[in-house]
Curated annotation (Swiss-Prot):
Pathway: Cofactor biosynthesis; adenosylcobalamin biosynthesis; adenosylcobalamin from cob(II)yrinate a,c-diamide: step 7/7. The keyword Methyltransferase does not apply. Belongs to the CobS family. One of its GO terms (biological process) is cobalamin biosynthetic process. GO terms for molecular function: adenosylcobinamide-GDP ribazoletransferase activity; cobalamin 5'-phosphate synthase activity. This is Adenosylcobinamide-GDP ribazoletransferase. InterPro entries: CobS. It is found in: Cell membrane. Keywords: Cell membrane, Cobalamin biosynthesis, Magnesium, Membrane, Transferase, Transmembrane, Transmembrane helix. It comes from Haloquadratum walsbyi (strain DSM 16790 / HBSQ001). It catalyses: alpha-ribazole + adenosylcob(III)inamide-GDP = adenosylcob(III)alamin + GMP + H(+); alpha-ribazole 5'-phosphate + adenosylcob(III)inamide-GDP = adenosylcob(III)alamin 5'-phosphate + GMP + H(+). Joins adenosylcobinamide-GDP and alpha-ribazole to generate adenosylcobalamin (Ado-cobalamin). Also synthesizes adenosylcobalamin 5'-phosphate from adenosylcobinamide-GDP and alpha-ribazole 5'-phosphate.
Length: 254
């Protein structure tokens, strides 16, 4: 069951060509901990350049990181940021929930969406730039841990959220309950191994910040959209990753 869930999650969260089938997808929907588990190999892949290419100029290294991140994960989650950005600027309508939800399905990107994507990507790049002021090993662990945290933030919403409407969000959320969070928490325990390299406080910052970001976005989504959608999950992934890296760097530098 877990192996099948991980395979389904890899197909959903990445562009790795492992194939798609209903059994794996259903297993993934019923196993939120798969989000966190997948964060480990995914985080390792995107963080490797900071160790293997540490002699490369930092701007180039950050560019390589972003290219690998997009190449491995695709643009689905970034598209969620764009849709949420457009929905966030909708106001002064009789039924803001319905209007905002309709914007989520609009294929055109407005100013709000473009701004949201730009701010998120630039924030991520600047966070990684700050991380490179440490050591290659610390940067590697920060980036890896942030990826695990971002995926766990998605799992948190899946376990505790209510779906805004029928769709991808509902397909994931309807299969989980808050009790499904316990395996997610257990899956985070290997990150304790980061403490000797980052320290206890920076490690806690990188792990907890994505979860806090998820709860903040959940509150907004409940009020603005009536619940969680697939776009909200994607936005949480992107925003919490960037926030986690910034939090880790700030606490490390203190």
């Amino acid at each position: 069951m877990v192996i099948s869930a991980i395979r389904g999650g890899i197909g959903f969260l990445t562009r790795v060509p492992i194939g798609h089938d209903k059994k794996a997808w259903d297993a993934f929907r019923q196993t939120p901990v798969a989000f966190t588990v997948i964060g480990y190999p995914l985080g390792t892949i995107v963080a490797l350049p900071f160790v293997l290419l540490s002699i490369v100029p930092v701007p180039t290294l950050i560019g390589v990181y972003l290219l690998i991140l997009i190449g491995v994960t695709g643009i689905t989650h970034i598209d969620g940021i764009a849709d949420i950005g457009d929905a966030a600027v909708v106001h002064d309508t009789d039924d803001e929930h319905s209007r905002r939800r309709s914007v989520l399905h609009d294929s055109q990107v407005g100013v709000g969406g473009a701004l949201a994507v730009t701010v998120t990507v630039v924030s991520l790049a600047l966070g990684v730039l700050g991380a490179t002021r440490t050591t290659p090993q610390v940067t590697f662990i920060l980036v890896l841990t942030a990826e695990v945290g971002a995926k766990s933030a998605m799992a948190l919403l899946v376990c505790t959220g209510d779906a805004a409407h029928d769709g991808l969000g509902a397909a994931l959320i309807d299969e989980s309950t808050p009790l499904s969070l316990f395996p997610v928490i257990l899956a985070l325990t290997p990150l304790l191994l980061a403490i000797p390299y980052l320290g206890a406080s920076p490690t806690a910052a990188v792990v907890l910040t994505p979860l806090i970001v998820a709860l903040v976005i959940k509150q907004w989504a409940d009020n603005a959209l009536g619940g969680i959608s697939g776009d909200v999950l994607g936005a949480v992934n992107e925003v919490s990753r960037a926030a986690a890296i910034h939090a880790g760097v700030v606490v490390w530098m203190l």
